[in-house]
């Protein structure tokens, strides 16, 4: 089987690359080998949702009046995102006559893999794991790590519901704690002059301001906003996982992309809608191939708060080996 004939994670891509349908498990499988190689294993996944989820709505008065707590700017941003994803779905249906598929077949196990493994983890080629907390490994990272073309972060944002789940990346209590945690990362010293920083955020409005305000985190790192990518979560039917107009739950997550202040923006870096059926909790699509289209195939990446390794990249966090245990994989025959 040649590289071109293997099952690609890309199910559809518009000519201008502003709209793409990805299969999340396949992005993980592709990330386990270098770009010129063919994946050798399949990852254990969750059953894909066949239909949208019911969306609990808040009360319309008192403490449940969500609109009273949202600034006009945040409301406008939500409306713009809703319009963007609605337009993307309309383009898929009308402009491109695309009706599926929205995912590939998945390797499902009736019983989830055990939380702890007695077998050594599977390590991709040229992957550099830093398994430990930001606080514990900061000095080691600072003294040994190179400069990166891309840094991807998926921080444990404050979230009450997530705190009830078993997750080594315990969510912080508030944004002040998050600022203290993230500012311990010597990111500016390890970003190339034209490097990019891409950060996953939740839909809590204060987080966007926390990053991009004049006194926000990006400014502290000497960065400025370039663009945003939106992951639109859909069921296998292609319908958004939650009602786009829902007040309380949104069917998307944002990836905020920044560069050094004053540096040149890559010509290929533009807004993007990524349509993908979600997998197990906390699993994001691997972004290596998408950013290679922007930065070139030789770009060196670092993923912070990683839950798996990527061939050719560095990964740092308490759970870098979480999905590298053999129980999560099956060899391709």
Regions found by a protein language model. Name each.
Residues 1-153, 158-182, 204-333:
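Class I S-adenosyl-L-methionine
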């Amino acid at each position: 089987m040649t590289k071109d004939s293997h099952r690609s994670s890309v199910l559809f891509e518009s000519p201008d690359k502003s709209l793409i349908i990805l299969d999340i498990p396949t992005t993980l499988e592709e990330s386990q080998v270098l770009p010129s190689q063919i994946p050798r294993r399949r990852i254990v996944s969750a059953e894909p949702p066949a239909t949208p989820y019911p969306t609990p709505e808040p009360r319309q008065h008192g403490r449940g009046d969500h609109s009273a707590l949202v600034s006009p700017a945040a409301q406008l941003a939500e409306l713009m995102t809703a319009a963007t994803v609605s337009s993307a779905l309309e383009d898929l249906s009308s402009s491109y006559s695309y009706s599926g598929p929205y995912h590939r077949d998945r390797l499902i196990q009736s019983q989830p893999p055990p939380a702890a493994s007695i077998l050594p983890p599977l390590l991709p080629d040229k992957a550099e794991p830093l398994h430990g907390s930001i606080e514990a490994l900061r000095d080691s990272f600072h003294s040994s790590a190179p400069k990166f073309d891309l840094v991807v972060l998926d921080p444990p944002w404050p979230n009450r519901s997530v705190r009830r789940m078993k997750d080594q990346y315990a969510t912080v209590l508030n944004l002040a704690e998050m600022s203290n945690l993230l500012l311990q990362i010597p990111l500016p010293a390890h970003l190339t002059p034209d490097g990019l920083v891409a950060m996953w955020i939740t839909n809590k409005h204060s987080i966007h301001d926390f990053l991009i305000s004049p006194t926000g985190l990006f400014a502290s790192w000497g960065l400025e906003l370039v663009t945003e990518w939106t992951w639109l979560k859909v069921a296998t039917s292609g319908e958004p996982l939650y009602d786009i107009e829902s007040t309380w739950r949104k069917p998307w997550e944002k990836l905020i992309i920044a560069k050094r202040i004053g540096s040149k923006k890559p010509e290929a870096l533009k807004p993007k809608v990524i349509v993908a059926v979600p997998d197990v909790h906390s699993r994001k699509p691997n972004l290596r191939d998408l950013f290679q289209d922007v930065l070139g195939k030789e770009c060196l990446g670092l993923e912070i708060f990683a839950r798996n390794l990527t061939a050719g990249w560095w990964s740092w966090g308490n759970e870098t080996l979480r999905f590298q245990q053999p129980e999560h994989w099956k060899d391709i025959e």
